[in-house]
């Protein structure tokens, strides 16, 4: 018979109180260990946390403000990060202890562990109280304070429409270029962007210069000065003028520019305005482009813009064989759509839209023969040259929104102050410009690729009803195919991106402060030179 010895647990007396306990390396009972060692030593039991009443955000040091609901995981993370001394212990658990919402108190229950003696680990539960203190964040301070701007960018364009600003506004939103603005005001001929420091304004001007041809002029106004310390306080104004040209305008090139572009034109169509201005000669398919510097050295203006566009009906198209990209040279027979039933005037013209137009299509163009142009605008015309009677610029479709049916997509707009006491014709003009911009988005895939377009809440159902309504009204099949597909639209996820955007803005703020110091040093050097 095999004997199995039974191992009995050794018991000892606690060296402090004499209670019989199982043997352990400390030779002390749990109560005595707790009385002798406090593992929460060095961890504060009461802290403060800053909360902005205006935007309901909490301060996460050093300068980041985060949105968090009461008793949420996000707020718990912010509170734990404020506790010093947790790196010396092991955090096992953390949770909330309920408090009255109006008490301005937050209580967090923590469970921690720490090795107190050799191989002896002590666990303890305790509560830390956070006192909520009110403090305005930087954004709310800027919003509440008046006349705190340091720099203003005055964006202007001398044209009779605002389609360019609608497009630029979408690019600003897509790239978040307006994140550092204090305020944005709408003006009759443009927009004003206000900034807290000059560096942010200069970055914004650089962004505008990268997307459209502009001319910039800087001025400054002395606000105060300290002669003893050789310091001064200025307000800066950046006047940014956009070239007075838009897509589908027709222009007469000055002789100097026409010569630089290989003697093209001189009557040409503006096909694109980005950081360069692109032209095409509708009679030869000759293309060219000029920079903002070239334009402002020899400025010129459009002979006609989209308000003078006339609708034509294409009767016949004969391709000549010459092509360039998506354009093809052709002889087109057409008549004014308004002349149907009134007269039988038919015109033969040459156009660059040969592979876009088919017999029966509608096209928009300019009635050059019936227009009166100043002699200064036709300075590029030679004596042996004649203006064409008509110039076509693009294909069009019957209006799809005469029945005022809702679109299944939308684009966002920058929050800004509108024009004070606008007149009725200004409101009507803005609505027409907006509708024209919406139609350009529908018809131009390249334009859609550059901006963010979002789905409506019930986009699929709206699109289905819209197409059905268009079919009932006899809209052309090609126009129906132009309707934006749902897979090309974005979901509105702005709420999920808020915190990340704020982190980016805080980084920009820090960079702006550093760069401002560099600019201030440069100004001091300039003053010394003077």
Swiss-Prot record:
- What family is it from? Belongs to the NMD3 family.
Q: Which organism is it from?
A: Dictyostelium discoideum
* Top-rank taxon: Eukaryota
Q: Where is the composition biased (Acidic residues)?
A: 500-530
This protein is called 60S ribosomal export protein NMD3
This molecule's function is given as: Acts as an adapter for the xpo1-mediated export of the 60S ribosomal subunit.
Keyword vocabulary terms for this entry? Cytoplasm, Nucleus, Protein transport, Transport
Region Disordered: start and end of each range?
497-530
Gene Ontology CC: cytoplasm; cytosol; nucleoplasm; nucleus
């Amino acid at each position: 018979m095999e004997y199995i010895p039974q191992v009995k647990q050794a018991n000892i007396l606690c060296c402090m109180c004499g209670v019989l306990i199982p043997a352990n390396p400390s030779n002390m009972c749990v109560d005595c260990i707790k009385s002798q060692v406090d593992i929460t030593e060095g961890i504060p039991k009461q802290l403060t946390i800053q909360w902005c009443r205006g935007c309901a955000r909490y301060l996460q040091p050093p300068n980041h403000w985060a949105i968090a609901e009461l008793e949420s995981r996000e707020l718990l993370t912010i509170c734990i990060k404020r506790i010093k001394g947790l790196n010396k212990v092991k955090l096992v658990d953390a949770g909330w202890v309920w408090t009255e919402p109006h008490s301005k108190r937050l209580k967090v229950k923590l469970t921690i562990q720490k090795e107190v003696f050799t191989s002896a680990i002590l666990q303890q539960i305790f509560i830390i109280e956070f006192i909520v203190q009110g403090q305005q964040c930087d954004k709310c301070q800027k919003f509440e304070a008046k006349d705190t701007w340091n720099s203003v960018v005055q964006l202007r364009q001398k044209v009779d429409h605002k389609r360019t600003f609608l497009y630029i506004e979408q690019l600003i939103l897509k790239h978040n270029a307006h994140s550092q603005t204090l305020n944005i005001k709408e003006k009759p001929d443009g927009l004003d962007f206000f900034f807290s420091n000059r560096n942010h304004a200069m970055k914004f001007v650089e962004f505008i210069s990268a997307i459209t041809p502009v001319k910039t002029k800087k001025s400054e106004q002395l606000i105060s000065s300290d002669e003893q310390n050789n310091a001064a306080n200025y307000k800066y104004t950046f006047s940014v003028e956009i070239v007075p040209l838009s897509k589908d305008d027709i222009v007469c090139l000055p002789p100097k520019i026409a010569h630089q572009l290989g003697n093209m034109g001189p009557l040409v169509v503006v096909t694109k305005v980005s950081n360069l201005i692109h032209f095409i000669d509708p009679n030869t398919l000759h293309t060219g482009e000029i920079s903002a510097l070239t334009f402002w050295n020899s400025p010129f203006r459009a002979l006609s813009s989209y308000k003078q566009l006339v609708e034509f009906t294409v009767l016949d198209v004969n391709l000549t064989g010459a092509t360039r990209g998506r354009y093809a040279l052709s002889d087109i027979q057409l008549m004014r759509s308004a002349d149907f039933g009134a007269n039988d005037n038919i015109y033969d013209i040459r156009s660059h839209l040969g592979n876009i137009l088919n017999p029966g299509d509608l096209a928009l163009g300019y009635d050059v023969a019936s227009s009166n142009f100043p002699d200064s605008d036709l300075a590029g015309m030679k004596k042996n040259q004649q203006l064409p009677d008509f110039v076509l610029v693009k294909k069009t479709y019957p209006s799809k929104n005469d029945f005022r049916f809702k679109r299944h997509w939308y684009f966002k707009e920058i929050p800004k102050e509108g024009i004070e006491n606008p007149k009725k014709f200004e409101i009507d003009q803005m609505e027409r410009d907006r509708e024209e911009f919406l139609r350009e988005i529908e018809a131009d895939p390249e334009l859609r690729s550059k901006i963010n377009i979002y789905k409506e809440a019930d986009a699929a159902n709206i699109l289905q009803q819209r197409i059905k309504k268009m079919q009932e009204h006899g809209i052309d099949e090609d126009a129906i195919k132009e309707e934006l597909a749902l897979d090309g639209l974005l979901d509105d996820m702005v709420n999920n991106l808020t915190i990340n955007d704020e982190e980016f803005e805080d980084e920009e703020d820090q960079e702006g402060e550093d760069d401002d110091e560099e600019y201030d040093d440069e100004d001091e050097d300039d003053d010394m030179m003077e």
